[in-house]
Amino acid sequence: SLTYFLTKPYSYPNHVWVDVTMHNLSLPPLAIKNPECLGLLHQLDRNKDVWMQHYCILKDGCLYFYSSIRSTSALGGIYLQGYTVTEQSLNSRRCIIELRPPSEEFKAFYLSAGNAAENKRWITALKMSINKWLPLHQAIQDFMSRPLEETRM
């Protein structure tokens, strides 16, 4: 079985969002409130060259993987900050969603929904979820780079 580990992203080491996403890992998929996208995705296991089906939930820049809709907790997830989302043609039969990481130290993920329309739905949702967090990331960076006397309340 495939397991994914969420590690605290270096850019948000003590942010409440990290605690929320870590908590969400322990929840069943339908207990996550207001997901941005949900449904079945196949993920390419490049070690075995096979596609594994997962029930997935996208919420606040994090993609959670479950073995099924009836799972009691997530297998794991991916923090999507910094990832780019593109559609690639694998062969004549299948278009895939490529999640490319911000640097070589992280791995790329290859996903596929049931059909082209589902792929487009996921791509749109993934891009929106990632972009929603870019202003927050920039605001945190700007705040952290200010002189100490300006950041006191």
Where are the predicted features?
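Polybasic, Ser/Thr-rich intrinsically disordered tails and inter-domain linkers
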Residues: 1, 5-33, 37-38, 42-47, ...
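Short amphipathic alpha-helical segments embedded in low-complexity Lys/Glu-rich regions
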Residues: 15, 20-23, 59, 73, ...
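Polybasic phosphoinositide-binding surfaces of eukaryotic membrane-targeting domains
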Residues: 32-78, 122
